[in-house]
Amino acid sequence: MQTAFDVIVIGGGHAGCEAAAAAARLGARTALLTHRFSTVGAMSCNPAIGGLGKGHLVREVDALDGLMGQVADAGGIQFRMLNRRKGPAVRGPRAQADRKLYAAAMQAAIRAIANLTVIEAEADDLLTADGRITGIRLADGREFSTGAVVVTTGTFLRGLIHLGEQSWPAGRIDEAPALGLSAAFERIGFALGRLKTGTPARLDGKTIYWEAVEMQPGDDPPEPFSVLTARISNPQILCGITRTTPATHDLIRANVHRSPMYSGQIQSSGPRYCPSIEDKIVRFGDRDGHQIFLEPEGLDDATVYPNGISTSLPEEVQRGILATIPGLERCNMLRPGYAIEYDHVDPRELQPTLQAKRMRGLFLAGQINGTTGYEEAAAQGLVAGLNAARCAGGGEGVVFDRADGYLGVMIDDLVTRGITEPYRMFTSRAEYRLTLRADNADQRLTDQGIAHGLVGAERAAFHRRKMAALAAAKTWARSLAVTPNEAAKHGLALNRDGVRRSAFELLAYPEVGWDDVRRIWPELGAVEPAIAVHLEIDAKYDVYLQRQTADVEAFRRDEGLVLTDIDYSLVPGLSNEARGKLEKARPRTVGQAGRLDGITPAALGILAAYLRREARRRPATA
């Protein structure tokens, strides 16, 4: 067997698959290390991809030729565009997935990638020399040499499952944890923290009384994640919605002392925006009920995931809780819910490329960086895999910034501010939401992906055709114009000012849609429907995008002021507090420094002035 690789990825979850695929797409000889190939692409918690903010990340991964979007399309059994009634900037594509179909599609995608070798084994140690990674050692003693390692261990680092008063070591249910790697990180000098997440019970859908719950259909037709997916071919299913009751809340209150989170058994922080049902009752006890989404796990699988009642209460209490919920009174619980604690690294130990500051060639992605969610993991994995391949090949790292995409927002948040609880992506975290929409991820990122060698020939050709068609349609729409009187003949009431307005300008009006301009110019029917959607959104946001472009340019100016190897003790005028924070964080740019807690606008002005003085001094002393 081959024992030398350019890149080795440890872990075959959502981050690991994207990391391995990205590195291999760049031509790096890549190994994906996983305990069992049959678990590659496993959905450890909820059987769904996307959502608010998260759906943006999936589209961005797809724009960079990642796997998740196409795999979700292959496994999706209910697609919904969340926030459809709101503006395009905050809409979030989401898909309910068939667990088996999703995993099978991911495994098939991994098998089909050139330059990628899958090794079924456990990593036990990281091999280093002179401040850089040189290889890994497996639990069976074998060693592999490499130019870069991407660690994507999810919840496996010293994972510990909690169920009521019981606890036992595990990476997820029925799978062993990874112990050796935690020791390796500590030996290198990382201070590891602990985080917690949880999952609800699994139910037998054949024993749910579906007549007692509200049924929720998906969108018709379903909208795919990937631009390369022509249509969704899987049968589409309904999900159910029920609620907890006062009896549910009383039972939880009576037993909350038996929850590991409240007994003191678990000390670590869980995800604020995905709380356990115990947390919901303690924190929001005045509510009459909490929604529960009953999500089927597959087309030929009766298992149902009750989204909204994650818990680690004892098994018998969980059964009692189900008996108080409409539709679930007599359902069979196939597996109890549980909580899991695991090690993580402070993401401020990382550069924006996701390479560790203290160890060249070591990259981290996913839950090890303090995030929660498949989509957050996948986006980090892609960036880490890209940069690991470039590092192994002697190239410079690639940084996606906050104006590039939600993946840039997430990584900047992590490496600049760190985390105190599992990090989840929301649209509210982004400053440039009008620009960073789910519908334009390919317009923002695919050209960058092509430039970095991430994007294959099929997607590159498709992208060029699409961009050419969009540009042509926009030019055409700007060339067609009507007077207010002419528009009135077609039912459009405009200000009678005699000014001719183009089709593109008409589309900017909130009450004017594509069908309205087609009534005036039937020839616009030749524009592809997908292109017409983009054209209308661009027109609606045009004025606002011009303003946001100015904001982005100002942001990029600050990001262009690089703080490389600065001795902050030599910068006059900085407070001791600012010096200490800058020395500890070592921000890459003035822009990143401004996002540190406690760094004032005055301190940023001092830094910018210092950089200008140093720039003037260099030519004089050269």
UniProtKB/Swiss-Prot annotation:
Pfam families: GIDA, GIDA_C_1st, SAM_GIDA_C. Its main location: cytoplasm. SUPFAM superfamilies: FAD/NAD(P)-binding domain. NAD(+) binds at residues 270-284. It comes from Rhodopseudomonas palustris (strain BisA53). GO terms for molecular function: flavin adenine dinucleotide binding. InterPro entries: FAD/NAD-bd_sf (IPR036188), GIDA_C_N (IPR049312), MnmG (IPR004416), MnmG-rel (IPR002218), MnmG-rel_CS (IPR020595), MnmG_C (IPR026904), MnmG_C_subdom (IPR047001), MnmG_C_subdom_sf (IPR044920). FAD binds at G11, G12, G13, H14, A15, G16. Signal peptide: none annotated. Its cofactor is FAD. Belongs to the MnmG family. This is tRNA uridine 5-carboxymethylaminomethyl modification enzyme MnmG. It is found in: Cytoplasm. GO terms for cellular component: cytosol.
